[in-house]
């Protein structure tokens, strides 16, 4: 390989890594949602917390801003799980498209 080909390969690799990082940041920001007057981040941590509280219908949890919020556990779990799945599926579709361009 000549130097021009090596430089082109390095730039393409850098662009791919940067695009993946931007994609991750984009979907991490989309994981945020509002519910019951609080801001929440959909993800395994929230879902595990809600599963631990499953025996109670209403609990008080701290949202992203450390504000105590009374929530209905089944409602918040359903919303968090649905939001998580929607965003992860969309992220996977975009990730697969980017991987094909490489």
Language-model features, listed with the residues they occupy:
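A preference for well-ordered globular domain cores
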Residues: 1-102
